[in-house]
Regions:
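Intrinsically disordered, low-complexity segments enriched in small/polar residues
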Residues: 2-282
Length: 282
């Protein structure tokens, strides 16, 4: 988008006219409104069932409240995206993603298809129903202001190298949440592995086009920050566009293979169903 000259915005009226002239401008990274205008819904998904369609540039964030049963598809469009994710129960944000329980209860530190994202109440917030990347992280969290300041010279949200936690703070504010409401996060598309000696090894990206699909098992507030992984060794602040698409579907139910995949997962689904049934939701 061209930068306006001083004369183009010299008065309030000129500034208004200039702003209105940009109304039809589209850029690579922006939300699609309404989301049903998204040109390529997933196979079998009607356009009117698409509820969120957005491309998030590197160094930016987004957020949305999604209904139970909604599927959220994240796509690494360039091979350099890194989607840091937080989930809160939409109507009671004190119940939120607990990464420690997500790893511990399920006996698996590596996120992928079939993994459940658990709250501190032992309930399922979301399930991973599809994964073509295999490069994710539930161990190291997102970047901090201090770390980015040392690495890139700045980590504030308005800088060229914003930290993930600083962007999470802004996303949280949009939902009445404070920094105290931000637990450790998980991230997708830039992986880590734990070596035999206990050190954390950065495995990076699987390349452009990788996708992960999450299914909301309760009404959730989704916070996303698309920033470089804190262990990314590249000296420059490198992060590509992230595709975000959500559409109406159905929550996991008894008889679904995911429900019965593990004893721990089954218990988490039963905890979730018990809670929702008592509230008249399920």
């Amino acid at each position: 988008m061209a930068t306006p000259s001083g004369t183009a915005t010299a008065t309030t009226y000129l500034a208004r006219d200039h702003a209105r002239a940009q109304a039809g401008t589209e850029v690579d990274a922006m939300p699609v409104l309404p989301a049903s205008r998204w040109p390529a819904p997933p196979e079998g998904v009607a356009a009117e069932d698409v509820v969120w369609a957005e491309t998030v540039a590197g160094g930016n964030y987004t957020h949305k409240v999604l209904a139970r049963g909604t599927e959220l598809r994240l796509t690494d469009l360039t091979g350099d995206a890194c989607a840091h994710l937080l989930l809160h129960c939409a109507d009671r944000p004190w119940e939120r993603l607990n990464v420690a329980d997500t790893v511990k209860v399920l006996w698996n530190a590596y996120l992928g298809e079939g993994h459940l994202l658990l709250s501190d109440q032992g309930r399922v917030l979301a399930s991973v129903t599809w994964d073509t990347s295999g490069r994710h992280d539930a161990l190291t969290g997102t970047s901090s202001l201090a770390r980015n300041t040392v690495r890139y010279g700045d980590g504030t949200p308005q800088s060229a190298s914003p930290a993930g936690r600083e962007l999470f703070k802004l996303a949280a504010l949009k939902h009445g949440l404070t920094p105290r409401d931000l637990p450790p996060s998980v991230s997708f598309f830039q992986g880590v592995r734990i070596a035999e000696d206990g050190t954390t090894e950065f495995t990076g990206s699987a390349g452009p086009g990788g996708t992960v699909t999450l299914r909301a098992e309760q009404d959730v507030t989704v916070l996303l920050a698309n920033v470089p992984h804190p262990l990314d060794p590249r000296p420059a602040y490198t992060c590509g566009n992230l595709g975000v698409l959500a559409y109406r579907a159905r929550p996991t139910s008894p008889g679904d293979p995911l429900w019965e995949a593990t004893p721990e997962g089954r218990r988490a689904f039963l905890n979730t169903a018990d809670h929702l049934t008592a509230r008249g939701i399920a």
